[in-house]
């Protein structure tokens, strides 16, 4: 017989990061506005595997993000596990968090059909357990709020991904306005193809800052750029932060990036 899984508001869970560290999140509410899904708050910080937290002290930590998820799936798959509980839910802070969604279709009463629309012009927002508010285009009030986040019900994979890296690899419309920020210790590798310029970019970030970049030109040459060698043959190292390009880039492995870098290091045109 399958083990009965019981979760209660206040429960605290641990996510093992796979690099000798672990992090924590707490189940703090159910959101009737979003399918009565579980709302969690993930805490800033990673801890050695032998660390034994004081739960009442842990919940006083800075909140990294809020999210909706299905706790049971993560528990059944051993993606997180319960380690304790606390009555401190931080609900005053949750009340100020904005959840964001967007619509790609809207109902047209004249035709009794749904019309396709631009999601970038049809955002809606809400606070936990409050009505959704259509806002049209994204506004500074929402995008610049410190706790604005994707309001979808996230899979266990997306929850763990964001806890581990500080961001998710999902391509979200929201990311055009709310920049993703990796943890300072995270190394990220991304690639992006500029169809207009016919240039393929490969990026290596340390935290939010660019470390290395490889550009494949339209004629098949490769340009290696770095902090120590930021300009070459009319090309310059990317000067923005991670969040400036993460919404339109695909992840690649560090192994693939380094293979490309090493293959063309010192051989640029």
Where on the chain are the PLM-derived regions?
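Short N-terminal edge-element motif at the start of the domain
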Residues: 1-46
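Short beta-strand segments
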Residues: 23-25, 212, 250
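Broad, structure-driven detector of short, well-ordered beta-strand segments within folded domains
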Residues: 25-26, 197-206, 214
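Acidic, aromatic-enriched beta-alpha/helix-loop junctions
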Residues: 36-81, 205-246
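Intrinsically disordered, low-complexity, charged/polar segments
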Residues: 48-173
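Short, compact, well-ordered microdomains
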Residues: 239-269
């Amino acid at each position: 017989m399958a083990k009965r899984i019981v979760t209660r508001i206040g429960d605290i869970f641990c996510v093992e990061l796979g690099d000798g560290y672990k992090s924590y999140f707490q189940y703090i509410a159910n959101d009737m506005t979003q399918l009565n899904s579980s709302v969690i708050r993930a805490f800033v910080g990673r801890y050695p595997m032998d660390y034994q937290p004081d739960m009442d002290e842990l919940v006083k930590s800075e909140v990294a993000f809020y999210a909706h998820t299905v706790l049971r799936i993560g528990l059944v798959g051993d993606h997180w596990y319960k380690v304790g509980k606390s009555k401190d839910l931080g609900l005053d802070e949750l009340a100020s968090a904005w959840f964001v969604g967007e619509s790609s279709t809207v109902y047209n009463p004249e035709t009794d059909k749904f019309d396709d629309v631009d999601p970038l012009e049809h955002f809606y927002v809400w606070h936990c357990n409050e009505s959704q508010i259509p806002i049209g285009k994204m506004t500074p009030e929402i995008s610049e709020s410190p706790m604005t986040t994707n309001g979808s019900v996230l899979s266990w994979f997306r929850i763990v991904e964001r806890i581990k890296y500080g961001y998710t690899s999902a391509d979200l419309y929201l990311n055009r306005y709310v920049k993703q920020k990796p943890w300072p210790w995270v190394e990220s590798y991304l690639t992006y193809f500029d169809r207009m310029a016919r240039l393929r970019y490969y990026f290596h970030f340390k935290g939010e800052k660019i470390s290395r970049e490889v550009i494949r030109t339209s004629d098949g040459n490769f340009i290696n750029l770095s902090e120590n060698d930021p300009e070459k043959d009319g090309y310059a190292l990317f000067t923005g932060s991670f969040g400036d390009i993460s919404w339109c880039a695909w992840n690649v492995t560090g192994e693939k990036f380094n293979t490309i870098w090493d293959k063309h290091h010192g051989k640029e045109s």
